[in-house]
Swiss-Prot record:
UniProt-recorded name of the protein: DNA-directed RNA polymerase subunit Rpo6
Gene Ontology cellular component annotations, sorted alphabetically: cytoplasm; DNA-directed RNA polymerase complex
Pfam families in UniProt: RNA_pol_Rpb6
Subunit-structure text: Part of the RNA polymerase complex.
Reported function: DNA-dependent RNA polymerase (RNAP) catalyzes the transcription of DNA into RNA using the four ribonucleoside triphosphates as substrates.
Source lineage: Archaea, Thermoproteota, Thermoprotei, Sulfolobales, Sulfolobaceae
Coiled-coil residues: none
Gene: rpo6
Annotated family: Belongs to the archaeal Rpo6/eukaryotic RPB6 RNA polymerase subunit family.
Organism: Saccharolobus islandicus (strain M.14.25 / Kamchatka #1)
Catalyzed reactions: RNA(n) + a ribonucleoside 5'-triphosphate = RNA(n+1) + diphosphate
Record's subcellular location: Cytoplasm
């Protein structure tokens, strides 16, 4: 019984490592929604846009925040805490 349990634990650990490596540089839909809503709030409170909004037909703050996110100009870093205690920092700014 102990050997079966060790085999299952090692498979679970391997699965967790693969899962973490796959999702390490991707954002979840909830993280994306949180970033866009936080940036839209900043824009609504008077923060300057990080893209030139004169050349595009975007007028509402959510569309502007989405466009800034798509272009990768947001100076925001996501701190993701993993179940094993590790912390991963994901920068949204594309170089």
């Amino acid at each position: 019984m102990g050997l079966e349990r060790d085999g299952i634990l090692s498979q679970d650990l391997h699965f967790n490592e693969v899962f973490v490596s796959l999702w390490q540089n991707k954002l979840t839909r909830y993280e994306i929604a949180r970033v866009i809503s936080a940036r839209a709030l900043q824009l609504a409170m008077g923060a300057p846009a990080l893209i030139d909004i004169n050349n595009i037909s975007l007028t509402d703050v959510i569309s502007i925040a989405e466009e800034e996110f798509k272009r990768g100009v947001l100076p925001i870093t996501i701190r993701r805490r993993l179940p094993n205690g590790k912390i991963i920092l994901l920068s949204l700014r594309k170089s």
